[in-house]
């Protein structure tokens, strides 16, 4: 497979490795991006790649709760300027109210539903696009439910650039639930606990760590012990309950939750634009385009 400059660029952005190292890794793995990342990590050239990819699109997240139902949603716009527009914020609120009331199963299902104003969600968004003058999309949402003995934790960071909604069972302490949501916003765990990590992922990480240790020239008789220690650190990076609590790093999140006789049922974290590629433009050209207007 031919290795293109764009592939090398993408691998560099994901790993921070040098151009020649990236080209060599892609060549050795026949252009397989995931395998190239693993190969660079095994050689100690690249750090663990988080699958967040580049943050690109603009917009806002919003969270609303009503009794035992909560919704978190993300609506995208083309520019940050529009995301701060009052008309955009009104649309965000209206969509949240509709989803909270009607609980559609998907974005596609929501688009065809009638709103309180008589128009469908799709028609309402199209109307907003005509007024605001930018493409606007309802990207995603999650509707969460809880019992009477549980608490929602809602946290918006930077006015809605990151939104987190948590559910804690066994407590009605919304402040603690919000603290956990704030922690999730800051640290971005992928799982609640270790038992949610697939055996395949754990084994893959163990193999990478083993190769790293061997590359460092460590004796084989201590490699296994080293690998387990490093694997524990890996779990601390990706599992919420194993992490040091952001408000008090001397405590683990699981200790904070246990102190309330509670358990973390679930969490949803949205970061505006994560995984969406933004159109790349030359900055000098962009400035000149603005000057010419």
UniProtKB/Swiss-Prot annotation:
Q: What is this protein called?
A: Elongation factor Ts
Q: What family does the entry list?
A: Belongs to the EF-Ts family.
Q: Per the record, GO CC terms? A: cytoplasm
Membrane-spanning segments: none
Q: What organism does the UniProt record list as the source?
A: Bacillus licheniformis (strain ATCC 14580 / DSM 13 / JCM 2505 / CCUG 7422 / NBRC 12200 / NCIMB 9375 / NCTC 10341 / NRRL NRS-1264 / Gibson 46)
One Pfam match, given by its short name, reads EF_TS
Where in the cell? Cytoplasm
Keyword terms = Cytoplasm, Elongation factor, Protein biosynthesis
Name of the gene this protein is made from: tsf
Involved in Mg(2+) ion dislocation from EF-Tu: region residues: 79-82
Molecular function (Gene Ontology), one example: translation elongation factor activity
What role does it play?
A: Associates with the EF-Tu.GDP complex and induces the exchange of GDP to GTP. It remains bound to the aminoacyl-tRNA.EF-Tu.GTP complex up to the GTP hydrolysis stage on the ribosome.
Task: Show the InterPro entries listed in the entry.
Answer: EF-Ts_dimer_sf (IPR036402), Transl_elong_EFTs/EF1B (IPR001816), Transl_elong_EFTs/EF1B_dimer (IPR014039), Transl_elong_Ts_CS (IPR018101), UBA-like_sf (IPR009060)
């Amino acid at each position: 497979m031919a290795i293109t400059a764009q592939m090398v660029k993408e691998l560099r952005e994901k790993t921070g490795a040098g151009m020649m190292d990236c080209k060599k890794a892609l060549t050795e793995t026949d252009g397989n991006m995931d395998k190239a990342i693993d190969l660079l990590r095994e050689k100690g050239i690249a750090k663990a790649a988080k699958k967040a990819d580049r943050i690109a699109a603009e917009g806002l997240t919003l969270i609303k709760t009503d009794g035992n139902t909560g919704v978190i949603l993300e609506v995208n716009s083309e520019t940050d300027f529009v995301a701060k527009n009052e008309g955009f914020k009104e649309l965000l609120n209206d969509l949240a109210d509709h989803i909270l009331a009607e609980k559609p199963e998907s974005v596609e299902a929501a688009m065809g539903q009638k709103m309180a104003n008589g128009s469908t969600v799709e028609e309402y968004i199209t109307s907003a696009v005509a007024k605001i003058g930018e493409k606007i999309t309802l990207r995603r949402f999650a509707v969460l439910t809880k019992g009477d003995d549980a608490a929602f934790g809602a946290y918006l960071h930077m006015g809605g650039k990151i939104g987190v909604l948590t559910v804690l069972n066994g407590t009605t302490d919304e402040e603690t639930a919000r603290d956990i949501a704030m922690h999730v916003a800051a640290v971005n765990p992928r799982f609640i606990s270790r038992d949610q990590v697939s055996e395949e992922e754990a084994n893959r990480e163990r193999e990478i760590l083993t190769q790293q240790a061997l590359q460092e020239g460590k004796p084989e008789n201590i490699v296994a012990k080293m690998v387990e220690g490093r694997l524990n650190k890996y779990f601390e990076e990706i599992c919420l309950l194993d992490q040091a609590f952001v408000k008090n790093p001397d405590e683990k999140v699981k200790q904070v939750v246990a102190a309330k006789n509670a358990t973390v049922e679930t969490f949803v974290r949205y970061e505006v634009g994560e995984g969406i590629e933004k159109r790349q433009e030359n900055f000098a050209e962009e400035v000149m385009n603005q000057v010419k207007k």
